[in-house]
UniProtKB/Swiss-Prot annotation:
PANTHER family: LARGE RIBOSOMAL SUBUNIT PROTEIN UL2M (PTHR13691:SF5), RIBOSOMAL PROTEIN L2 (PTHR13691). Residues 23-33 have a biased composition (Basic and acidic residues). The gene is rplB. Residues 210-220, 269-278 have a biased composition (Basic residues). One of its GO terms (cellular component) is large ribosomal subunit. Residues 1-58, 210-278 are annotated as: Disordered. Belongs to the universal ribosomal protein uL2 family. This is Large ribosomal subunit protein uL2.
Length: 278
């Protein structure tokens, strides 16, 4: 992937950029793998906002991605196309399996049209192949990692993300997460070789607020700019500092978002470094 910069023909275009989509080989998705997708605008079933700063955006169709590839062990597949997916930052790859079935996967870096993909413990260690952690050599960079055997890929699915297998210890494999945390995961869990492609996506300059609205992202308003009825930091005569330590709109102190006493904490070997004093 590359990034194409715009010339400053308008204030909104000045400094903005866009992906060049050079790796995309087809513009229309596979119809059998597309589902309708309705928008919630960040509201729950009662109409209350439960996820702020969401709403609007271009209409999308959902592409069904295969995050559980266990049932295709030993069935080779060919990469038919690399496609754009509006629902995620990564590109997706359309696989044609030897038994006639078609499926989408998240496209890893360096995967090309025409490549051969394998699943199962006997698969080669090459980008796009999916196999259990216990069959992957130590030091390998992986993505789309399961947290429970058969539970489907949960970790490292966005553009440019990856996890490194740093050690194996009995029934567990030790993984270095994107946050720097080292965690034990059941060695029977599956992972895909390589890192997720489209890594330069994070370098795109969106240029103007309107492009974020096309993506369905609404403005983020500071608490000190609100009225007292709307936020604990609101109100005051003129500009103020908020008058207290930073809190959420509901009065919860900022930071410390990890739940204490979580059962899976015992699997953490080394915690992520946050840079904050505890």
């Amino acid at each position: 992937m590359g990034i194409r910069k715009y010339k400053p023909t308008t204030p909104g275009r000045r400094g903005s950029s866009v992906a060049d989509f050079v790796e995309v080989t087809r513009s229309e998705p596979e119809k059998s793998l597309v589902r309708p997708l309705s928008k919630s605008g960040g509201r729950n079933s009662t109409g209350r906002i439960t996820s702020r700063r969401r709403g609007g955006g271009h209409k999308r169709a959902y592409r069904v991605i295969d995050f559980r590839r266990h049932d295709k062990d030993g069935v080779p597949a060919k990469v038919a196309h690399i496609e754009y997916d509006p629902n995620r930052t990564a590109r997706i790859a359309l696989l044609h399996y030897a038994d006639g079935e078609k499926r989408y996967i998240v496209a890893p870096n360096r995967l090309k049209q025409g490549d051969r993909i394998e699943n199962g413990p006997a698969a080669d260690i090459k980008p796009g192949n999916n196999l259990p952690l216990r069959n992957i050599p130590t030091g390998t960079v992986i993505h789309a990692v399961e947290l429970r055997p058969g539970g489907g890929a949960k970790i490292a699915r966005s553009a440019g993300s990856s996890v490194q297998l740093v050690a194996k210890d009995g029934p567990y494999a030790q993984l270095r997460m994107p946050s720097g945390e080292i965690r034990n995961v059941d060695a029977r869990c599956r992972a895909t070789i390589g890192e997720v492609g489209n890594a330069e996506q994070s370098n795109i300059n969106w240029g103007k607020a309107g492009r974020m609205r096309w993506k369905g992202k609404r403005p983020s308003v500071r608490g000190v700019a609100m009225n007292p009825v709307d936020h604990p930091h609101g109100g005051g005569e003129g500009k103020t500092s908020g008058g207290r330590h930073p809190v959420s709109p509901w009065g919860q102190p900022e930071g410390r978002t990890r739940r204490p006493g979580k059962p899976s904490d015992k699997l953490i070997v080394r915690r992520r470094r946050t840079g904050k004093k505890r």
